[in-house]
Amino acid sequence: MPGSLNLIAAKLRRVFALLPYFPRTLALVRDAAPGWTVTWVVLLAVQGLLPVATVTLTRSVVDSLVPVLRRGATWQNVWPTLLPLGLMAAVLLVGGVLRSTAGWVRSSLSELVQDHIRALIHRKSVEVDLAYYDLPEYFDHLHRAQHEASYRPMMLLENLGSMLQHSITLVAMVAVLLRYGVWLPAALVVSTLPAFFVLLHHRLRLYRWRLLATAPERRSWYYDWLLTARQTAAELRLLDLGAHFQSAYEAVRSQLRGERRKLARDQGLAEAAASACGLLVTAGAALWMVWRTTQQQTSLGDLALFFQAFNQGQGLAGSLLASVGEAYSNSLFLGDLFEFLSLDRKVVEQERALPAPSALGQGISFDKVSFRYPGSNRVALQDFSLAIPAGSITAVVGRNGAGKSTLVKLLCRLYDPDAGSVRIDGVDLRQMRVREVRRLVTVLMQEPVQYSATVAENIALGDLAASPGPGVIENAIGEAGAEEIVTRLPEGQKTLLGKWFAGGTDLSVGEWQRIALARAFQRRAPVIILDEPTSAMDPWAEADWLTRFRTLAQRRTALIITHRFTTAMYADRIHVMDEGRVIESGGHQELLAKGGAYALAWQRQMRAGGLGS
């Protein structure tokens, strides 16, 4: 017995530990739709009183029918039954109208709450540091927030609404039953407790399983994406990989189905045992009430009222405790949502951050910078120093993994260095306002985003604060050397790009890169950062664009990250990186004359391109 009490106490402690989520959830719902929330709660409260009226009127109808059965169905005898029957019909009609209205209000409220939660998730996913995207744990959190917690607040609100409605009705039913014996309400509650604790136990098991199942479920979604995405369609057919990934998908889904079925089976067996316990209590109470009726201690109306009140009360108590159990379950999942929404940013501004300069006077410097990506033991930069003079074109070359792209992320303050500092005009980036630092630069990433929008919209995204006039867009197209591409499109700048939506036109990788370049140039920032800007261009297009670029970069500071020496040779100064350090620096001819790593790599690249030594 003490062991059972301790188990019950432990389960109740788990429930109470989740109570802080309730006000936070109610605040979320209130912020999403305050008026709809109040309306829905009022409707639930009124509906909670109607069953009591129905039960009470049933007793009046039965008692008024007894004289009719004894004396005959004359108008004088039947008349007293019409009033309670009419009132019962009115109550049922009002109940139906309220249920329909509450359903409509609930549907509207649900849409508003889900959209509000989705907006919070979107805002947080944009606000958090890029470092989180290097951690698988972040994607597990995001997965649960997107596909579980996004609708759980509404479910919890429904649980609380059901608890309110059932509590009101149950209190009234208890008041009705008290006249027949104080022990009846206690028996009613006791009969539902086994099912309640079964529900709590299995909801906790389900939640723990969901935590463990997040990674396999995400893997199944990945296989699903591989099998259905446009990006993978050609290679899956060429390499005949469809059956392989279908088999991998089925293996993961089979594992998840088996685990879920076992949970459902265990819960079903436990619920059956709990129902048997409740049935014994119900049978005992019913036999006691029938015995009292046979002893003429209660009327037939009382017996009818008892059966209705006890059965409904038992159902209400069970529903109330089930709502508590569901609220417990939903609160467990809401912990994931609130944990996701509480993620801290590490790239933060100082309390009195300095404004970033509108233009560079001295330049950019990396001073003994060391950095490794979150969750990685590999050092990306080690004691790295580099100077980029204002108004110059600087190229950084090196092997894949040398740390070139890491420079871009640190300079844009997407990450902060573990040691050392990145400075603009001698001021550490961490002392400046983050948004203003990022306004200083325009970046072409190594893998630019292919937005499913029109050409003009794609380019205008480079600077939404600027006026997206036709002249501005045309200038950016010209600077990127994309005039011919846009001219060939069916509707020019108004052509929808990509195949996500009907009527879209797809581009080659090189053409997409030109559109991304135009987007970068549309942002009139004093610092231009280009990460592999010509990687998808043929040699003729590369030479044409590089000739234009020297003109475009005048009075601006440019940093080019590249593995193509034909691109690097146009820079004022070239830095060669290897294993997170600069190993050579100089102009193109100067580095060739040194005969070091740059000269050796240049010769290899020229021979590979068939251009001689």
List each model region and its residues.
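Extended non-transmembrane interhelical loops and adjacent amphipathic helices
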Residues: 1-23, 111-154, 216-259, 331-344, ...
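ABC-type nucleotide-binding domain
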Residues: 355-613
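Membrane-integrated ABC transporters
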Residues: 1-51, 69-84, 102-106, 123, ...
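Cytosolic ends of transmembrane helices, especially the final helix of ABC transmembrane type-1 domains
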Residues: 241, 285, 303-343
